[in-house]
């Protein structure tokens, strides 16, 4: 399968992108040149998604929120992806040593600390810049004083080096590294309680949408990225005032919208430039 397209970049420059998926793997091209990694393609074409399951960003564990945070960090600081690749490699080596109870566990600590602290600093910088956008978005969408707090993945009273030493015996017992940015989270709280414990499914969706909207507005202002936003079944879990809040916030975004739905909800965001219909597995213009 091959998908190609043309995007408008900085200063109204145009660039062609392409992705081809075969049995042997996935390849990508940017302006006719092979992309060495899919991260290059992702950086060239920023896409975010709001779909019916977006409430899981609030409801489920830290993995989803780390991915949400890192998506924005990568676009503001492109070198972040290299840090994460290095960290993942070192973490894998340390965990392998823990599983075999090898005496080389501590050999990996210095690298883990150095790269882990760099990742944490990048995430904290992003969160500081994001918070004003978050506060405006969550107020407009939910009307609730929901708070975001970055939890770095180890005790605030310890450096990462100290945490690794303190948890060494426990790490050996569990055979995995328990401190570091891979254990980080973004706590979502309302009046000091976990938002997932007090918000309805519809409210969780609006909070998760606010997290996404805040990201997009930050990227537009900070690095002049004009993202594409994919909306799938936007009215799911929403009705009345909540749906109107959602429509108002999304309509204010200065980005391309692609809306998919079984119902004519795309009209809620204004007259679409193009409309297509899926029929018998084929996409046809209307």
Regions found by a protein language model. Give the residues of each.
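Conserved NTPase motor "head" modules and their coupling/switch loops across ABC/AAA+ ATPases, GTPases
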Residues: 103-114, 118-228, 237-256, 265-270, ...
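Nucleotide-state sensing region of NTPase/ATPase domains
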Residues: 1-64, 68-80, 128-131, 135-136, ...
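Conserved short hydrophobic beta-strand within the ABC ATPase nucleotide-binding domain
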Residues: 273-276
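Long, charged N-terminal accessory/stalk domains
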Residues: 56-58, 63-106, 110
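Walker B catalytic acidic pair
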Residues: 232-234
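Active-site donor-binding loop signature of nucleotide-sugar glycosyltransferases
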Residues: 52, 278-280
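Conserved D-loop beta-strand region of ABC ATPase nucleotide-binding domains
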Residues: 260
């Amino acid at each position: 399968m091959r998908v190609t397209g043309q995007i408008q970049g900085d200063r109204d420059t145009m660039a062609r992108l392409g992705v081809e998926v075969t049995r042997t793997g996935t390849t990508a091209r940017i302006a006719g040149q092979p992309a060495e990694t899919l991260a290059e393609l992702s950086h060239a074409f920023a896409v975010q998604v709001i779909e019916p399951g977006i409430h899981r960003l609030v409801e489920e564990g830290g993995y989803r929120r780390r991915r949400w945070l890192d998506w924005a960090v990568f676009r503001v600081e492109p070198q972040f992806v290299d840090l994460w690749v290095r960290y993942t490699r070192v973490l894998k080596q340390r965990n392998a040593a823990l599983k075999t109870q090898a005496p080389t566990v501590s050999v990996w600590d210095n690298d883990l600390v150095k790269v882990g602290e760099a990742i944490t600093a990048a995430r904290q910088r992003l969160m500081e810049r994001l918070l004003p956008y978050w506060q405006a978005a969550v107020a407009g969408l939910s009307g609730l004083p929901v708070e975001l707090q970055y939890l770095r993945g180890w005790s605030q009273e310890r450096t990462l080096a100290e945490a690794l030493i303190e948890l060494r015996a426990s790490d050996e017992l569990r055979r995995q590294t328990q401190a570091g940015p891979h254990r980080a989270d973004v706590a979502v709280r309302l009046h000091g309680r976990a938002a997932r414990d007090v918000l309805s499914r519809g409210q969780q969706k609006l909070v998760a949408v606010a997290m996404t909207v805040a990201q997009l507005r930050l990227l537009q202002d900070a690095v002049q990225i004009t993202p594409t936003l994919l909306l799938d079944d936007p009215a799911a879990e929403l009705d009345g005032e909540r749906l109107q809040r959602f429509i108002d916030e999304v309509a204010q975004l200065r980005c391309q919208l692609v809306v998919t739905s079984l119902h004519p909800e795309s009209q809620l965001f204004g007259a679409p430039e193009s409309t297509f219909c899926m029929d018998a597995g084929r996409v046809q213009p209307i």
